[in-house]
């Protein structure tokens, strides 16, 4: 019983010190049809303009953008859709 109590106290101290990380990679987005008949591009998909990217449901705290990123082959940067947090400037990739 004493061991269980020590583990519980240790876990509480670790959470208090480190905090709980927020997962910014799972921002909900609105998957809609574009005027040209195609559907919007999900985050991490290659894009040409921001209008092609799916917009987040929460447009007050988040925004969608099309920006440069290194692809897996790392030969040259390409444009990919992102959903970013307004306050923390963290974007999904």
From Swiss-Prot:
The family database entries (InterPro entries) matched by this protein are listed as:
Cys_Knot_tox
On whether Acetylation is a keyword of this UniProt record, the answer is no
Q: Which domain of life is it from?
A: Eukaryota
Record has Repressor as a keyword: no
Q: Which cysteines are joined by disulfide bonds?
A: 40-54, 40-81, 53-66, 84-91
Primary location: secreted
GO molecular function terms noted in the UniProt entry: ion channel regulator activity; toxin activity
Q: Name one Pfam family in it.
A: Cys_Knot_tox
Q: Which GO terms describe its cellular component?
A: extracellular region
Q: Which UniProt keywords apply?
A: Disulfide bond, Ion channel impairing toxin, Knottin, Neurotoxin, Secreted, Signal, Toxin
Q: In which tissues is it expressed?
A: Expressed by the venom gland.
Record's signal peptide: 1-16
Compartments it resides in: Secreted
Q: What is stated about domains? A: The presence of a 'disulfide through disulfide knot' structurally defines this protein as a knottin.
Name the family the entry cites: Belongs to the neurotoxin 27 (Jztx-72) family. ICK-72 subfamily.
The protein's role, per its UniProt record: Probable neurotoxin with ion channel impairing activity.
Q: What is this protein called?
A: U36-theraphotoxin-Cg1a
Q: Which organism is it from?
A: Chilobrachys guangxiensis (Chinese earth tiger tarantula)
